[in-house]
Amino acid sequence: KPKEDKEWVKFKAKHITSQSVADFNCNKTMNDPDFTPDGQCKPVNTFIHSNTGPVKDICRRASGRVNKSSTQQFPLTTCNKPIRCKYSQSNTTNFICITCRDNYPVHFVKIGKC
């Protein structure tokens, strides 16, 4: 079994959540010490409500480094621009554009098609 790409491991931690949209809390998640290792609030982050399989499938047969669009829509939560680390939260369902490297998602590019 090939070793998982380090960037994919980071991508999963940063962008994929098994929590439902209803249960998800931007302030709780974004202020978690794992998310703010240097104590700085991250200005914006989008979370994909999914298990890892369908997200990884976007990068199937993607050799090299390339941006790919999902063929299915995902429920998404975006945590926005904190004022004193208090986040606003917006939910949507949409396609996603991610950067794939050798069959692994490594970067969230944007909501919507590439």
Curated annotation (Swiss-Prot):
There are at least five different forms arising from glycan heterogeneity. GO terms for biological process: defense response to Gram-positive bacterium. It is found in: Secreted. The keyword Acyltransferase does not apply. GO terms for molecular function: endonuclease activity; nucleic acid binding; RNA nuclease activity. Gene3D superfamilies: Ribonuclease A-like domain (3.10.130.10). InterPro entries: RNaseA, RNaseA-like_dom_sf, RNaseA_AS, RNaseA_domain. Keywords: Disulfide bond, Endonuclease, Glycoprotein, Hydrolase, Nuclease, Secreted. Its EC number is 3.1.27.-. Substrate binds at residues 42-46. GO terms for cellular component: extracellular region. Glycans are attached at residues 27, 67, 91. Endonuclease, hydrolyzes highly polymerized RNA, poly(U) and poly(C), and the dinucleotides CpA and UpA. Hydrolyzes rCA, rUA and rUG. Has cytotoxic activity against cultured human submaxillary gland carcinoma cells. Belongs to the pancreatic ribonuclease family. This is Amphinase-4. It comes from Lithobates pipiens (Northern leopard frog).
